[in-house]
Swiss-Prot record:
Name of the protein this chain belongs to: Glutamate racemase
Native species: Haemophilus influenzae (strain 86-028NP)
Enzyme class at the top of the EC tree: isomerase
Annotated pathway: Cell wall biogenesis; peptidoglycan biosynthesis
InterPro entries for this protein: Asp/Glu/hydantoin_racemase (IPR015942), Asp/Glu_race (IPR001920), Asp/Glu_racemase_AS_1 (IPR018187), Asp/Glu_racemase_AS_2 (IPR033134), Glu_race (IPR004391)
Role, per record: Provides the (R)-glutamate required for cell wall biosynthesis.
Amino acid sequence: MDKKEKRPTVLFFDSGVGGFSVYREAKKLLPNWHYLYCFDNAGFPYSEREEESIIHRTLAACQLINQRYPLDAIVIACNTASTVVLPPLRAAFEIPIIGTVPAIKPASEITKTKHIGLLATKGTVKRHYIDELIDKFAQDCIVERLGTTKLVEIAEQKIRGHSVDLISLKDELSSWAGMADLDTLVLGCTHFPLIKDEIQLCLPQVKYFMDPSAAIAKRIKYLLDDKNLQVQNEKYNQMFCTAHFPEESQFKKALHLWGFESLEVIKID
């Protein structure tokens, strides 16, 4: 590819590395675009934070990165953050802001038993907008909700090279293990597609796993493809975090596997 070709710059933002599940679908669909990824590990997990804190930290990180790399779009690759930060971000930026919404509508269309599980963070499952999605698209279904921080931590450990603790995973999902007609699972946190295979081992009755990542990638393409983008970008893909962490050196060695050249710590407090 000619380096002088205009490439959109897209920032993916999450409190952890769960947003990799969205980024990898975008990279698969649009391999030559310029990607930045920021995970706010100093504020992790967002499911334990107040809404005002999530808004402040997300805005601060996005504005700081935008000053250095003029952005063409921001993807909030975090369901918990997407429930609160989209309006303030859209007020602060004149570029597309793309959120992550649990795939309840497609789940209601594909389920055969009309019994759906929504697996998300504690912050997401209690949001009013989840009630609205269910009322609008899944009134004829039984929708079980399970809010968990443990699965987020398990996914974080997996992406950092650790083995998945299946015993802990099974224990966390045990309340659903006996639901024989639970045939559809909405992965309502971007971390969970990263441990989908392990979840399936624990819930073998589930036939359909609903992950919005591919749809988000198509949305990015729709909003930015063939647009008159003014920046001629020759930058390499870069990752940011907000605090140093124990596995940092090992993590950096694996960056190229995800298509990134470097990891930089930024301060947003």
